[in-house]
Amino acid sequence: MENILKSKLWSISSFIENKKYSFNKDEILSHLPGEFIDEAIKSISSWEGYSPTPLIDLNKLNNELGFKNIYYKDEDKRFELKSFKALGGAFAVNKIADEKGDITVATATAGNHGRSVAWGAQRLGLKCKIFISEFVSETRAEAMRNLDADVIKVKGNYDASLRECIKQSKKK
């Protein structure tokens, strides 16, 4: 542990505490309407296969670093998507489908967000187009295809895939 504490990476204070920014939970939450948060919780917790992700107490690390508590939020089993981003894209698909009905959803992504959107679309039986840059790995593309998404590889970087997504989405 002593070697880790002396390492260059560890000495960067923002790794543990960003002294230039103080997190104000109430201010951040004031930008999200409470009813929206309540709606998301109610919707997501009703999805088949939902369970709260466990918090794992890292007591040995607590003791070594002198902190009262350190927890690890284990998202590994979140709808088998293994990502903390698994909820946002799928919830957006759910919300839009509730308002618009039978639609095709589309997004640009480099990976996890696209998997979430594809999973949400598959769950609701919707068509899904995922635009990725040429630099996204075939493994990531295949993971989205396995969720029935039409994966479109675009020459260029993420911004190019986003522009193509917007362009294609405007077509009827």
Predicted regions and their residues:
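PLP-dependent amino-acid enzyme catalytic core
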Residues: 1-172
